[in-house]
Amino acid sequence: MHAFAPEFGRVAKSYKWPIAKGQTSNLRLLMHRFLRRISIRILSFALAVGCLSATSYGQATSAVIAVDHGPNAQQQLSKHYVILVSLDGFRYDYAKRYHADHLLTLAAQGANAPEGMLPAYPSITFPNHYTIVTGLYPEHHGIVANTFYDPARKEEYSNRDAKSVGDGTWYGGTPLWVLAEQQGMRSACFFWVGSEADIQEVRPSYYLKFDGKFPNGKRVDQVLAWLHLSPEQRPHLITLYFSDADTAGHQYGPDSSQVADAVHELDGEIGRLMDGIKETKLPVDLIVLADHGMVKVEGAAIRLDQYGLNPSWFAQIVDSILYPKSDDDAQRAYEALRGKSDKFLVYRRAQVPGYLHFDSNPREGDPVVVPTGPYLITASGDSRGAEHPPVGMHGYDATRMPEMKALFVAAGPDIRSGVAMMPFENVNVYPLIAKILGLDITNLKTGPIDGKLGVLEGILKSD
């Protein structure tokens, strides 16, 4: 309740007891106003942390963690709202292919990328979610894989490890919620990579620790509950995450009935969200996108140790990311793998093609192995997935495999209607959202971003 303590302590006028007869009506009015103010603050707090039902859509959740950043600054109260929704693994063509009516309606009402949005390399979940909210390529923000090793720290980061996920020192860049909070604007994250961490000593005003079993409907309920907070407490930036399409794609492949079912389930939740937004009558821009696509895996897993790779050359191996003990060992590994198969390319890290933006961060390993097709590559038979590879996979170069391209649709008061965009890189989403929210990104503490506003500025309505 810290956010509301100043309100409780505010005194409009002092009275001495006993109260004179003429003062009674004034005191009653003041007490009425004071109690009403307290009630509104308590209601706002209850909705924020999930104690009460906000709308007819259901209950908010008690799992929300509220951080006391104070109310929205005065200059932020008139700003519009952005809800950023990620459908993990939702390939660019799923909506049309599986008749996701609500997403297709959203696309028709606003802007969309019919041929998809290009994920950063590697096209996997943690790097791309964090790229979307920082405007930086993975090698610049540091989250280069779901699991990786940092040679300087001599530590491993893993999306399966709560300690590293919540450690803000792993994360570079300035995430959108940090940007918002630093400029006096409240934010909320219903799951997003980095949102549990103390990045630049800042967390969202409202966030949750990841729980993959959390019901989708309750996620939407909580987002709508946030929109029903008082203007002072209401977040202007909200993120929302769903994993269903990715899970089904891995287990059954992108052509399966299970993926179709997941698409329909998610589309239903998007429809509920659209209806709920409309009911609020707030100026909300809804952006629904994905981190990457999905492709069916071909053949058995490719083991690099069968091509002469010697584990003794490495200080650490994480899946197929190789961390050599020395530069000489990196060169030995490169020479052992070079030209051995047409199913992968191998580069010394500094020689990785520039368009991949994967050539300067020690966390990326050295040498770097890049698949040429939908193959699962592991360092050895002990690597995760070597024995029983998934049916569907991602992580590949989107310029080689268009199946890696992701969904992007956006609609709302700031988005032009009927706009179809050519494929664009997802680093450009960050400056678009900052522009809609009126947030300044010209002098970030972490330096300039990789994304460019000019790429997507054309989908915005003229001021």
Stretch-by-stretch model annotation:
Residues H32-L43:
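Bacterial N-terminal signal peptides that target proteins for export
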Residues R41-A54:
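Bacterial N-terminal signal peptides
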Residues Q59-K79, Y92-Q182, D198-I199:
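Active-site nucleophile/metal-coordination loop of metallo-enzymes that catalyze phosphate/sulfate
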Residues L136-G253, D342:
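His/Asp/Glu-rich, glycine-adjacent segments
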Residues Q76-L77, N216-H228, A245-L286, I433:
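A long, amphipathic alpha-helix that forms part
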Residues L84, H102, E265-R303:
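Metal-dependent active-site segment of extracytoplasmic phospho-/sulfohydrolases and closely related
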Residues I317-K435:
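Active-site neighborhoods of enzymes that stabilize oxyanions during catalysis
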